[in-house]
């Protein structure tokens, strides 16, 4: 139980340091991977439970003190919506893959990849006209675009990818570089479809 307490203490520091935007929370969630030893990673289900428990505690602070944490005078309703988006990003994979979490951890040692996309390069390349072949990647791209539509600015693409990698590292294989590129191009395509590209100078 000592390592669970250790996780909890570290997570309290991470999640309560700066909660002014969902993208920062997503970034902190992704950075948790670097805090955990291989032994703790191999206890994926316990880690996920510990994260959810602490997030539930933080949720109260976010919703009840939204104007403090958001820094932009968000209403309680807006804070609740943002909170739901955070949970969706962090835990979308859990239900379908937690049953097999014990068999995939030997792949984790050297598979933590950093996304190389940036705000400057995110929209440089034109997307292909092919329909998305991977529904999980498409859902990740959709969440990014939904955040742009709802909050008027794009989340840090690196942070969204890193959070997704964190959950994948516990329950499966992290996104490969080519998969990250697929998501990037899907985001461009969806933004063009929704006629949001003209507002990019306001988002970044």
Swiss-Prot record:
Domain of life from the UniProt record: Viruses
Positions of transmembrane segments: none
Keywords: Early protein, Host cytoplasm, Host nucleus, Host-virus interaction, Phosphoprotein, Viral penetration into host cytoplasm, Virion, Virus endocytosis by host, Virus entry into host cell
Compartments where found: Host cytoplasm; Host nucleus; Virion
Protein's GO biological process: endocytosis involved in viral entry into host cell
PTM comment: Phosphorylated on serine residues in the 115 N-terminal amino acids.
Induction, per UniProt: Expressed in the early phase of the viral replicative cycle.
One Gene Ontology CC term in the entry: host cell nucleus
Family statement: Belongs to the asfivirus phosphoprotein p30 family.
Function comment: Modifies the subcellular distribution of heterogeneous nuclear ribonucleoprotein K (HNRNPK) and may contribute to modulate HNRNPK functions related to processing and export of mRNAs during ASFV infection. Necessary for virus internalization.
UniProt subunit comment: Oligomer. Interacts with host HNRNPK.
Protein name: Phosphoprotein p30
The organism of origin for this protein: African swine fever virus (strain Badajoz 1971 Vero-adapted) (Ba71V)
